[in-house]
Amino acid sequence: MREVLGCLAVRLAVGRMPEDELSSFEDLFRELLNHPSYEPAEDLLEVDRAFHDLVLRCSGNRWLMDIAGLLLDRSQLIRVISHKHPGRMEESWHEHLGLIEAIRGNDAAAAERWALVHVANARESVIQSIMP
């Protein structure tokens, strides 16, 4: 479900995201990549959620914002497990940077591919964490 909603949100958000917000998140993700041992995890999850909320808001679709936002709320524990998997946070920041680059380039297809990669990698990290 996250794949479908996330890809739709990203596709709709291309061309609608304010450059200043994209730049702020880009700077933040690059800073986090330069300091991979940063903690606490709650702060990192807040950054991740804020970026997802920006994408949803910029989709311009109220229904999508509500449903996908609820899904993100309900999957918080899964997101915590995913982010605790070794190397997942850094991988996630790279995925977000790829998504930003695609959005900035007005490339909806590339943005959608990055969204799919992001969700697939998150799912795989959860599976590896709970079924070692």
Regions found by a protein language model. Name each.
Residues 87-88:
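Hinge/beta->alpha junction and helix N-cap segments in small-molecule ligand-binding domains
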Residues 118-132:
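Short, charge-rich amphipathic alpha-helical segments embedded
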Residues 2-10, 15-81, 93-102, 110-121:
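Conserved amphipathic alpha-helical segments that form helical-bundle/coiled-coil interaction surfaces
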